[in-house]
């Protein structure tokens, strides 16, 4: 039997997924069922775009519910000790400077389930995170990105 994929995430990330799941089950699911009922009342389902759209949305909502239930069931919580560290690990915020004289950037490395690059949270599967994980403050690291290679120096890990 194949083992199920685990989803590393913070407690905060798990709670966000649980809230989204609750919203989908209690609100969105009911809204979609109501849209399907209304669309059915329009008659002929073979050329009923409202019905087709509502059924598509229902499939999306049910798929997302299944996905969230699986992620929550297989969540592995990353403990945040709140302490500074010298080593980059999952759940830590790492600040680095692009060399030779670039700007400083900071990212929190999280599991893919809660990654949001616009909020400074990158997936542990991303090229940047893969290059930084396990490295220490002061180390110079070469990162392979889709845009090319960049060299950075790790400034802090929190």
Curated annotation (Swiss-Prot):
Disulfide bonds: none annotated. GO terms for biological process: DNA-templated transcription elongation; regulation of DNA-templated transcription elongation. This is Transcription elongation factor GreA. Keywords: Coiled coil, DNA-binding, Transcription, Transcription regulation. Belongs to the GreA/GreB family. It comes from Bacillus cytotoxicus (strain DSM 22905 / CIP 110041 / 391-98 / NVH 391-98). Necessary for efficient RNA polymerase transcription elongation past template-encoded arresting sites. The arresting sites in DNA have the property of trapping a certain fraction of elongating RNA polymerases that pass through, resulting in locked ternary complexes. Cleavage of the nascent transcript by cleavage factors such as GreA or GreB allows the resumption of elongation from the new 3'terminus. GreA releases sequences of 2 to 3 nucleotides. Pfam families: GreA_GreB, GreA_GreB_N. Residues 3-75 form a coiled coil. InterPro entries: GreA/GreB_C_sf, TF_GreA/GreB_CS, Tscrpt_elong_fac_GreA, Tscrpt_elong_fac_GreA/B, Tscrpt_elong_fac_GreA/B_C, Tscrpt_elong_fac_GreA/B_fam, Tscrpt_elong_fac_GreA/B_N, Tscrpt_elong_fac_GreA/B_N_sf. The lineage of its organism: Bacteria, Bacillati, Bacillota, Bacilli, Bacillales. The gene is greA. One of its GO terms (molecular function) is RNA polymerase binding.
